[in-house]
């Protein structure tokens, strides 16, 4: 049976803006209050999805969240009509208001953790939405994320959906941004790597001091238990706390894995040798490539600024691997020089493809942030909601949908306009019909 890794990218929502909400994410903070282009951002995302589909990859799309989140504002004491709620919140609590307008769900690497059927005890693909407790604006997402995932992967014969972990910092979970999987073939049993930033219940362990560690060891363990993973195919690795304090807020900012390759910066992990020995032992026979980038080749600052590791590492139809990189990598001399050399080395990585995702990059998210990876066999793939799969016709429909509903320019001040709320709801209501999702948003269930 054929096996695939399918990338599901998040559609950028109509309220895409630069509010600088993500403390610990340097790019997000640096671009706070800049004017955004929701239309351009959505089209950049769609163009990347289509480009991967044209490369022969199987590509899906996940719907965005409904924003502004008026229900969240009502829970916090704002009342009256939707227009009154928006105006009150924007005036009385602007930071909270902006958090309730975030389009951050476009970064679907944080949507959930996914374990393929080859790894799980019951032979199903398992999904656990991330609770994203560390950032208020993202903690609003898990319930609707779960709705969207259930509507996309609806067949209970093949897909198992869990509730997100408790909404508490002790179980802070950031999803696939801190999870990767190494395997020989996508349909074979692999080794799942869970990367965490701190221990919630043991303060004697190393932890960052400046920026928060968003993923806990205890959360990673819980997800592995929920998914029915065996100890024989799970490795827990602590991210280097010093890197978190320098702006490496998720592990996918400093490493990326695919099949038998782990591409990483030498400073990425604690106890690297011990962790890699465990990976090798659990991976078993076969070539396994640990591609280490040393500081002399690419400084930590250049790696973070360019998002060298927040790239997608994909396997092409001919078996060679390609790095899907933001144009920021091409524009950085040290990073560009390294990548040009990398494709000539004796590793599976033979191609670099650059794509413009600057609207996302300015908010602190590169190509890898924009996608959720789901490994499936052909039977499971056939059971996915086919209206969420990218092809020429759906690409055209979604582009037309963006043209019809999205604004060219959006400032933070525009977010209080009830017309934007109504535009967004109209757009998303139409999108759920395009993607055949049913009613996944609270405003559709009134």
UniProtKB/Swiss-Prot annotation:
Active-site residues, as the UniProt record annotates them: 174, 250, 369 (nucleophile)
Protein's name according to its UniProt entry: N-succinylarginine dihydrolase
Keywords: Arginine metabolism, Hydrolase
Gene Ontology molecular function: any one: N-succinylarginine dihydrolase activity
Subunit annotation: Homodimer.
NCBIfam families to which the protein is assigned, alphabetical: arg_catab_astB, PRK13281.1
Catalytic activity: N(2)-succinyl-L-arginine + 2 H2O + 2 H(+) = N(2)-succinyl-L-ornithine + 2 NH4(+) + CO2
Coiled coil: none
Pfam families for this protein: AstB
Job description of the protein: Catalyzes the hydrolysis of N(2)-succinylarginine into N(2)-succinylornithine, ammonia and CO(2).
Keyword hit for Hydrolase: yes
Family membership noted in the UniProt record: Belongs to the succinylarginine dihydrolase family.
Residues engaged in binding substrate: 19-28, 110, 137-138, 214, 252, 363
GO biological process, one term: arginine catabolic process to succinate
UniProt pathway: Amino-acid degradation; L-arginine degradation via AST pathway; L-glutamate and succinate from L-arginine: step 2/5
């Amino acid at each position: 049976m054929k096996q695939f890794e399918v990338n599901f990218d998040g559609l950028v929502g109509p309220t895409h803006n630069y509010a600088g909400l993500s403390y610990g994410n340097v790019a997000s903070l640096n671009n706070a209050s800049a004017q955004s282009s929701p239309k351009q951002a959505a089209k950049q995302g769609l163009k990347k999805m289509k480009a991967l589909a044209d490369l022969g990859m199987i590509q899906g799309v996940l719907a965005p969240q409904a924003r502004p989140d008026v229900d969240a504002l009502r829970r916090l004491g704002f009342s009256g009509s939707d227009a009154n709620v928006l105006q009150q919140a924007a005036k009385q609590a602007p930071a909270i208001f902006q958090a309730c307008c975030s389009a951050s769900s476009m970064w679907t690497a944080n949507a959930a953790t996914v374990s393929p059927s080859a790894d799980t005890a019951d032979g199903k693909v398992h999904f656990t939405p991330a609770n994203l407790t560390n950032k208020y604006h993202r903690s609003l997402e898990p319930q609707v994320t779960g709705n969207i995932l259930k509507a996309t992967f609806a067949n209970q014969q093949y897909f198992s959906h869990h509730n997100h972990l408790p909404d508490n910092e002790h179980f802070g979970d950031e999803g696939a941004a801190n999870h990767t999987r190494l395997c020989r073939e996508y349909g074979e049993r692999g080794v799942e790597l869970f990367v965490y930033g701190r221990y919630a219940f043991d303060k004697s362990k190393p932890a960052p001091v400046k920026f928060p560690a968003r993923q806990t060891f205890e959360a990673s363990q819980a997800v592995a238990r929920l998914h029915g993973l065996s100890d024989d195919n799970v490795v827990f690795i602590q991210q280097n706390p010093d890197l978190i304090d320098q702006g490496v807020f998720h592990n996918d900012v400093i490493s990326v894995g695919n099949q038998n390759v782990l591409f990483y910066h030498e400073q990425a992990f604690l106890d690297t040798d011990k962790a890699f020995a465990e990976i090798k032992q659990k991976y078993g026979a076969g070539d396994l490539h640990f591609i280490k980038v040393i500081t002399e080749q690419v400084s930590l600052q250049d790696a973070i600024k360019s998002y060298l590791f927040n790239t997608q590492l994909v396997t092409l139809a001919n078996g060679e691997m390609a790095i899907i990189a933001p144009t920021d990598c091409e524009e950085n001399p040290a990073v560009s020089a390294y990548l040009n050399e990398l494709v000539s080395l004796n590793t599976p990585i033979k191609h670099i493809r650059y794509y413009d995702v600057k609207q996302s990059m300015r908010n602190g998210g590169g190509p890898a942030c924009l996608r959720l990876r789901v490994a499936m066999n052909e039977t499971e793939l056939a059971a996915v909601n086919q209206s969420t799969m990218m092809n020429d016709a759906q690409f055209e429909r979604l582009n037309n949908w963006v043209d019809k509903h999205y604004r060219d320019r959006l400032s933070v001040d525009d977010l209080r306009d009830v017309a934007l709320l109504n535009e967004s709801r109209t757009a998303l209501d139409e999108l759920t019909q395009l993607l055949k999702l049913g009613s996944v948003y609270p405003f559709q269930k009134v």
